[in-house]
Amino acid sequence: MPKIKTVRGAAKRFKKTANGGFKRKHANLRHILTKKATKRKRHLRPKGLVSKNDLGLVVACLPYA
């Protein structure tokens, strides 16, 4: 049986945690930052976790993670 391919875009966006979850970065923090409030940018800074609703999609994209 052939190996399952990893979705490379997902591999660059998500990192597996010790408890089986996945870390992710928040969106909206790349460009056009001058019109966004400092508070909004500060809250987007820390890493988040993938929600349980989306976990199945991420696991399917990363079969060897």
From Swiss-Prot:
User: One GO biological process from the UniProt record?
Assistant: translation
Q: Which GO terms describe its cellular component?
A: cytosolic large ribosomal subunit
Q: Does the keyword Oxidoreductase apply?
A: no
Alphabetically sorted, this entry's keywords are: Ribonucleoprotein, Ribosomal protein
Q: Which GO terms describe its molecular function?
A: structural constituent of ribosome
Keyword Transferase (UniProt): no
Looking up PROSITE patterns in the UniProt record yields: RIBOSOMAL_L35
* Family designation: Belongs to the bacterial ribosomal protein bL35 family.
Q: Which HAMAP family match?
A: Ribosomal_bL35 (MF_00514)
Q: Which InterPro entries match?
A: Ribosomal_bL35 (IPR001706), Ribosomal_bL35-like (IPR021137), Ribosomal_bL35_CS (IPR018265), Ribosomal_bL35_sf (IPR037229)
PANTHER family per UniProt: 54S RIBOSOMAL PROTEIN BL35M, LARGE RIBOSOMAL SUBUNIT PROTEIN BL35M
Q: What is this protein called?
A: Large ribosomal subunit protein bL35
Q: Name one Pfam family in it.
A: Ribosomal_L35p
Organism, as annotated? Yersinia pestis
